């Protein structure tokens, strides 16, 4: 009979190993509540203690890399909530637990509720990014839902006054701690939406323990924030404090002061941007005016080159040259005719053809008359064309405009005055008239209506 059961016989080592594997694989991590006793901390930094209740106890160990994350010092007799792995110490066969985290019993229960509500609302989509409303930019009125006596309100108002003193602020005072706080926060959110006075809400309070911040882990508050038509910025506690309200809000600020920074404009920065824009505009105007001034100078020089008086002088010079050429040509023709006449006379004298001489003389006289008339006609035509050109040039000349009583005024640096803002009282300006120039001092500047 013994031989048939030898396959089921365990050594002590194998038994303890099998039990350890069963405990670790089947149980996994569990939450255990109990009272601490026999707490010790040797030089290694590990914690060793017993966790017990009224009828049982179990040995516990919490290694240094885990207990350094515990925010309090465990005390004998303290009720705690421990998240641990169940195992067995094989050399002695001692059953024990290895703690991974530890919380005071009250906070531990709240943490469980927090995780359950977080999972529930997440599954319903209340945290989805698609539901987040954009914040107004800039905000025209800020609503603040917090305690009227808390430090958070003071911090928010201080930042808003520093950054944007003209920004209107509406305070919806509520309790932020205690049994009545969630209901008051919900009513304040609903009131702000009903009134429609502001375009962004800051909902929050200062720092505290998990119990102090619990109002912002309330399901009613979370759903009120989600239903708000006004964008909500959550500002609960410090940067390390994360509440359900932070997940539901359109934007989470790490602190109340940071929330005020987010919803407000920095007027000093805005002023600097305006001043920078003014400087750039001034530089652009200076460049534009300098460019127009250069363009005006170029046009002015071109007009001077094409001034009617200059063109008239050139025409007169050309006409004088033509007259000289015509005179030279006439003299040459007369000289040639005279020479021909002399030759003919000589020939006639030699041949004495009197009738032919008379005819030749008559022909010469006719030619001289026709030549003279032709010259006179050409001169008359040239004078008429020259007169027409002068009349046309005078019609388009700026001097003609001056002759009608208009004037052109310029500053001391040669810029043409178009608007009164180009001069001020005491400036000297130069005015061009039809027959000359005059300088005058500006006594006063009066804008036109």
From Swiss-Prot:
Major subcellular location class: cytoplasm
Any one GO BP annotation for this protein: DNA catabolic process
Domain of life where this protein originates: Bacteria
Lineage: Bacteria, Pseudomonadati, Pseudomonadota, Gammaproteobacteria, Enterobacterales
Protein purpose: Bidirectionally degrades single-stranded DNA into large acid-insoluble oligonucleotides, which are then degraded further into small acid-soluble oligonucleotides.
UniProt protein name: Exodeoxyribonuclease 7 large subunit
Similarity remark: Belongs to the XseA family.
Root EC class: hydrolase
HAMAP family: Exonuc_7_L
Pfam families cross-referenced by the UniProt entry: Exonuc_VII_L, tRNA_anti_2
Signal peptide: none
Catalytic reaction annotation: Exonucleolytic cleavage in either 5'- to 3'- or 3'- to 5'-direction to yield nucleoside 5'-phosphates
Location within or outside the cell: Cytoplasm
Keywords assigned by UniProt, alphabetized: Cytoplasm, Exonuclease, Hydrolase, Nuclease
GO molecular function per UniProt: exodeoxyribonuclease VII activity; nucleic acid binding
Self-association state and partner proteins as the record states: Heterooligomer composed of large and small subunits.
